[in-house]
Amino acid sequence: MALTLRVLCPDQNVFDGQADEVILPSTTGQLGVLPGHVSLLTALDVGVLRMRDGNQWTAIALMGGFAEVDDDEVSVLVNAAEPASGINAEEAQKQLSEAEQAWSKFDGQPNSPDKIKAQQAFQKARARLQATKAN
């Protein structure tokens, strides 16, 4: 028995298919979902969704949102998502380095819109790079 997984963004359907296992980046930590999982609704952090089909693992970088698990269906609604297969690892590493430098300029400073924006850019860049390493 498998899970039906849907990953949806406002502008696209990123994934719609079957998976034997799904690992979600919830705001309280990694959340594993197998067939027969109890129903739940959870907030998702910026991070990597991992799904297993047989022995094959696939990753999708998620940019925050929500997930619902109900009757072996996992619906993931996110602000943005990018399959690892579409991410250039070298470019992702470069973006992470740039985002880390931009964020480090705010060390020791109180929160400001610019600091929060830099932190979010860092988290997104890190998720993209992690997704390339998850496959």
Swiss-Prot record:
SUPFAM superfamilies: Epsilon subunit of F1F0-ATP synthase N-terminal domain. Residues 91-122 are annotated as: Disordered. Its main location: membrane. The keyword Ion transport applies. It is a peripheral membrane protein. It comes from the Bacteria. Pfam families: ATP-synt_DE, ATP-synt_DE_N. One of its GO terms (molecular function) is ATP binding. GO terms for cellular component: plasma membrane-derived thylakoid membrane; proton-transporting ATP synthase complex. It is found in: Cellular thylakoid membrane. The keyword Transport applies. Disulfide bonds: none annotated. Keywords: ATP synthesis, CF(1), Hydrogen ion transport, Ion transport, Membrane, Thylakoid, Transport. InterPro entries: ATP_synth_F1_dsu/esu, ATP_synth_F1_dsu/esu_N, ATP_synth_F1_esu_C, ATPsynth_dsu/esu_N. Coiled coil: none annotated. Belongs to the ATPase epsilon chain family. F-type ATPases have 2 components, CF(1) - the catalytic core - and CF(0) - the membrane proton channel. CF(1) has five subunits: alpha(3), beta(3), gamma(1), delta(1), epsilon(1). CF(0) has three main subunits: a, b and c. HAMAP family: ATP_synth_epsil_bac. Produces ATP from ADP in the presence of a proton gradient across the membrane. This is ATP synthase epsilon chain.
